[in-house]
Amino acid sequence: MPKIFCLADVCMVPIGTDSASISDFVALIEKKIRESPLKSTLHSAGTTIEGPWDDVMGLIGEIHEYGHEKGYVRVHTDIRVGTRTDKHQTAQDKIDVVLKKISQ
């Protein structure tokens, strides 16, 4: 499979915990993501991970399993993935285009 570049928006949530807050879980997962060489950006509803498709999907699988290894019995992951073949575009590139259009 070709090394197609992708942007993946990932939201991972533990199910069945004693608290409505998930910040401890998010911090645990985010530390693991930051150990990866892939670029990532934490935001209010998840993390955007950038890189080759196979590497990004591999990391998502690893962090999902990591949640279980850390004692979370149920982990739910929502993933949105975007690719394009006409040009290379990072998450920041996409933001910059919109900000430029807003300022016009």
UniProtKB/Swiss-Prot annotation:
UniProt xrefs under SUPFAM superfamilies: MTH1187/YkoF-like
Keywords, sorted A to Z: Cytoplasm, Nucleus
Pfam families with a match to the protein in the record: Thiamine_BP
A cellular component annotation (GO) from this entry: cytoplasm
Cell compartment(s), UniProt: Cytoplasm; Nucleus
Family named by the database record: Belongs to the UPF0045 family.
Other facts: Present with 1900 molecules/cell in log phase SD medium.
Entry protein name: UPF0045 protein ECM15
Organism, as annotated: Saccharomyces cerevisiae (strain ATCC 204508 / S288c) (Baker's yeast)
Lineage summary: Eukaryota, Fungi, Dikarya, Ascomycota, Saccharomycotina
